[in-house]
Design a protein with these regions (language model features):
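C-terminal helical cap and adjacent loop that interface with cofactors, partners, or active-site loops
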Residues: 18-23, 55, 228, 245-261, ...
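Basic phosphate/pyrophosphate-binding loop/patch that engages nucleotide-derived ligands
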Residues: 149-155, 171-186, 199, 205-208
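Core domains of carbohydrate- and sulfate-ester-processing enzymes
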Residues: 189-230
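Beta-strand-loop-alpha-helix segment that lines the small-molecule cofactor/substrate pocket
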Residues: 112, 117-165
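Rossmann-like dinucleotide-binding domain that binds NAD(P)(H)
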Residues: 215-301, 307-315, 387-391
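N-terminal Rossmann-like dinucleotide-binding module
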Residues: 18-86, 163-166, 257
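N-terminal Rossmann-like NAD(P) cofactor-binding module of classical short-chain dehydrogenase/reductase
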Residues: 107-108
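N-terminal secretory signal peptides and thylakoid transit peptides that target proteins
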Residues: 2-23
């Protein structure tokens, strides 16, 4: 039992009301500190046993000295599957029970986005170290509270942006900055171009399975009817529980850009504009499936294009784009570099390949890095410390905020906006055109 804990004495509604009132005062709690035992073992508990949770269970189980000591999920079917994989692990439906258990040294959080911060704060309050999946926060306020909790309770806290642990990243930074292999950096283009499908639009609310503890699944989210076809995974495309493609894939690429191009010197953009919408599909989602973003960083400008619709109606191919579908292009005075998860290629001015980079995407090594920090009690060796993770997540939250604050498309917003907005609008127009849509079509918004 954690005396005085906000965790133990709050309901979903109370958490929402407290947050809206201006902030949560982090309670002082007993802080058991992990210490080396004879076998240097770390007992890890998992909150969230779905797709990503299962991948992380596999990764952590391969780290020497790590025991999968607990699994937790409000979905009974997923929990049972996790128990079958790790029969020696304790199993809970309520994350608070896992967090309270004194045998658990560290917690891995792979829930829906809206649970990330609250679960992390509760775990750190209980003296656990935390590995939390990306994006860190569902809102920037939550992220700041999580950073504060890590500092207050002296916890090791790592964000699941595993590409930070890919050795390739250091090689690329040396090539671009120290060696000046392509000259001066001029601009950056970020791409997330990948076809997805409609999530459906029911005429009646989705029935929640009887074996799901829906109140625990909702947590701090608003209890409202769901009209999509599936409860799981497609929560990404609902602002109530997800962060859209920007928080799903965009966080990985933008984190790479912050790391490789800016070397974390730029915390957040100074100005940001967005144009896009949710078009083509008449479904229950409310996050954009096409979005162009311009970011003023105070130095190197960043453009981002996001497209989940196909190149043409009924097609399966993505719209045409320069560079990787999920990656980024660093335009330089002497050529350009194209980076993606696990690999990268540098080209000269004439488009000739002059150097390639090969990595491991950080899978496995990122989890090892977290455990190393837990054992050494040294957050400085983390490759994706919670402060860095909060800053990278902020880029996604700001891009989403720019979209949500936007209004019906007005050419003046583009004409008098950031320099790259005209190019971004033209790019969006080309993606929309095969579907019989344009910038003036219903659903297209600009900020």
């Amino acid at each position: 039992m954690i005396e005085g804990s906000f965790m133990l004495n709050s309901t979903r509604r109370q958490f929402i009301q407290t947050g809206m009132a201006g902030g949560i005062t982090l309670a002082t709690a007993a802080q058991p500190v992990w210490s080396a035992n004879a076998n240097n073992e770390v007992n890890v508990g998992f909150i969230g046993c779905g797709g990503r949770g299962n991948i992380l269970m596999s990764a952590f189980s391969k780290v020497s000295g790590v025991t999968i000591g607990g699994v937790c999920d409000p979905d009974a079917e997923r929990l049972e599957q996790a128990k079958e994989r790790f029969p020696k692990a304790q199993a809970w439906t309520d994350l608070r029970d896992l967090i309270e258990d004194k045998s658990i040294d560290a917690v891995v959080i792979a829930t829906c986005n809206h649970w990330h911060c609250l679960a992390a704060i509760w775990a750190m309050e209980a003296g656990k170290d935390v590995y939390v999946e990306k994006p860190l926060s569902h809102s920037q306020w939550e992220g700041e509270q999580t950073v504060a909790a890590a500092e207050k309770y002296k916890r090791i806290c790592q964000l699941g942006t595993q590409q930070r642990s890919d050795p390739m990243q250091a090689e690329i930074k040396t090539f671009l900055h120290k060696e000046k292999g392509l000259g001066d950096i001029v601009s950056v283009q970020v791409n997330r171009v990948g076809v997805r499908s409609s999530i459906g639009k029911r005429s009646t609310p989705l029935l929640i399975p009887n074996d799901m503890d829906y109140d625990l699944w909702l947590g701090p989210a608003i209890d409202e009817p769901i009209f999509r076809d599936k409860l799981q995974y497609d929560w990404h495309w609902d602002w109530n529980t997800g962060s859209g493609e920007m928080g799903n894939w965009g966080i990985h690429i933008l984190d790479d850009v912050r790391n490789v191009v800016f070397r974390d010197a730029v915390k957040v953009p100074t100005r940001i504009q967005s144009i896009g919408g949710r078009v083509v599909w008449d479904d229950a989602g409310n996050t954009p499936n096409v979005q162009m973003v311009a970011m003023d960083t105070g130095s190197v400008p960043v453009q981002l294009q996001l497209a989940n619709i196909a190149a043409e109606p009924g097609g399966k191919k993505s719209p045409k784009h320069r560079g990787p579908g999920s990656g980024y292009i660093v335009q330089c005075s002497g050529g350009h570099y194209e980076g993606r998860r696990g690999s990268g290629v540098a080209f000269d001015r004439n488009g000739k390949e002059i150097r390639s980079f090969k990595g491991d995407s950080g899978n496995g090594s990122h989890q090892q890095n977290f455990i190393d920090a837990v054992r050494k009690r040294d957050q400085n060796i983390l490759n994706a410390d919670i402060v860095v993770g909060n800053d990278s997540t902020a880029w996604c939250n700001l891009a989403n905020s720019a979209f949500r604050a936007s209004r019906e498309y007005d050419p003046n917003l583009v004409t008098h906006g950031l320099p790259s907005m005209n190019e971004q609008a033209e790019r969006l127009g080309k993606i929309l055109s095969p579907h019989g849509l344009g910038l003036q079509s219903k659903g297209i918004q600009a900020s």
